[in-house]
Amino acid sequence: MKKWCLLLLGLLPVTAWTQETTSLRGVQVTAQRRLTDTGLQKSSLDSTILHDHIASSLADILTRHSTLFIKSYGRATESTAEFRGTSPSHTQVTWNGMRINSPMLGTVDFSTIPSYFIDQATLYHGASSMHLTGGGLGGAVELKSLVPNISGHLLQYVQGIGSYSTYDQFLQFSHNGPKWSSNTRLVYSTSKNDFSYINHDKKVDVRDEQGNIVHSYHPKERNQSGYFTDIHALQDIFYNDGAGNRMGLSVWYAHHKRGLPFLSVDYKDDTDFTNEQDQNTLRSVLSWTHTESQWKSTVRGGYAYQDIAYDYHTTRQGIKNDITQSQSHTHNGYLQAEADYLPHEKWMLNAKAEAYYNKVRSHDKSPFLQHENYNKGRMEYHGSLQARWRPVSPFSVAAIIREEIYGKKWIPVMPALFADYVLYAPWKLVAKASVARNYRYPSMNDLYFKPGGNPDLEPEKGFTYDAGVEWDIRSKAFQLKGSFSAFDSYIKDWILWTPNTKGYWQPSNVKKVHNYGTEIMLEAATQIRKHARASLTANYAFTPSINQGKPSNDNDASYGKQLCYVPKHSANISARLEWKTWALQYKWIHYSERFTTTSNESDYITGQLKPYFMSDMAIEKAFRWKRLDASVKAVVNNLLDTDYVTVLSRPMAGRNFEIFIQLRPLWKQKRQAF
């Protein structure tokens, strides 16, 4: 404790940025902005992409506009992100500065985050995640709410209607004044989600009068128990006194009621079985920022609460028979202090101290357990020091030292080094390189879940090396922006849940994994004519993720094989053509084969998931009147009606349609562009 107090005292004079970037006064502004990104491999998603249409979750946006692999089996189903072939728990996520990874699972379900609620998303790849937080062995995602980009008031309503009795509604009211700003957003979505599909996991035999099989076919079935209702409410309030002080408050409530779809190999009738999950989440962050000529400091505090109830029962002859019931409650408290100091235009110093308190209570009723699962609390302390230096104009270096404490256990020091060099200034052509050591501490379920939790687990350890180039070429009517990066990562003591001899699953440190590969990101835009514009974004990732751990027994054939559900190749393209008040958009994604077994068995039908290509198309028309802006947008998902699966025995929807109507009343204030 004495050691931690000394570390905390050394970091207390410092705190973090507010929701949007605030410039420091004087010459330091230019230097600080250039130095901040020294050596970082990152990509950003702005509001144009995030606010594409109201039916999109952040999982949909990341699937179509990033190199991340989103493991999901449809809308309103659990959607986790995998950076560079790592585990979903290796992706750390913050919202307005507060980490929102589940303390139980260590992951984030991106399907529960409406993209309309996020104003800016930044992805930190590999070692660059150390700039934001620890534990991101694959990377980190930073989500922010920003001051509304309007002058005066904005009222917006969006109504969406789609296939499978799907309805989406979005309401926003924003105000931006000289000192006070407010942004209120509401989302309501509901759907039966009962799409039909050809079940390739079942076969029906047709017999003649003698009982001989004449032919067989795969039956057409409906997605059972896939219904959902999602409700979200977000309130952001910002205050700027004009004298260097800013305050922000963000409060977000969400309710989800979701049926859990039956497997395609399931023969049960959904009228007899109920399989659903109810979830309530509350998140809040309060921040205060003070800016002077060479200092910028922020103090943040936050609280998050979540309860999840899972119910699986049968109802026969009016009698309910419980099979499994589980409920969990989590409480998270958060405090942060951070500051940046610019002693000279060539130097930038940063320090940060954070404290989290996680409380988890889990209760299960199942064949294995009939009472409280576990009830645990844990303190976490995080501290970091960062220094950035530009000795000569084209060259910059940065160093980060991070330390974390979980309960009474200290994580070894996590260092990171970054460097970049400007190769050609007119094109903003920059070479970047970095190396970092990172650790991730086990989640609460890893340690305490009953049955199976393992309190003796060691933290996962990773070394990551990154190198690449980025560029931004611009002319009067054309822009080409992009990056190419190569990475090499080694993760030891990978935590893996495996079945034991007692009939349940248990985690252990069993794997050594080698992740390596390349990432390519491109953005292009051109002004064709006065009223015509074309743009394109493209992403590609090559991510071998190889198990190099010792075989657990003589029959273990997993050594040297690709990890389960990790595609080696993934790519996406988004093209948009605008002409006057019309817009046409096309999106394309591809994933290579994914193995479902650690031994990569391809001889079995269930041993691998076939590669697939997916296309979406949308057309939009904007209308502008004196007192109203409006638009109508029609979307075709799965344009080519591709038959595919992303998770074994989880069918996906075929071609389906959505239409959105957006209305924006206008006041005398300056209108916001569409």
What are the functions of these language-model segments?
Residues 115-156:
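A beta-strand signature from Gram-negative outer-membrane beta-barrel systems
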Residues 294-312, 360, 424, 431-432, ...:
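Membrane-embedded beta-barrel scaffold of Gram-negative outer-membrane proteins
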Residues 151, 175-275:
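Periplasmic-side early beta-strands and strand-to-turn transitions of outer-membrane beta-barrels
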Residues 257, 307-309, 407-413, 419-466, ...:
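Surface-exposed extracellular loop regions of Gram-negative outer-membrane beta-barrel proteins
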Residues 98-126, 451:
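Short acidic/polar hinge/loop motifs at secondary-structure boundaries
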Residues 59-102:
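Extracytoplasmic beta-strand/coil segments of soluble accessory domains associated
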Residues 391-396, 485-490, 509-598, 629, ...:
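Gram-negative outer-membrane beta-barrel transporters
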Residues 24-53, 80, 88:
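N-terminal periplasmic "start-of-domain" segments of outer-membrane beta-barrel proteins
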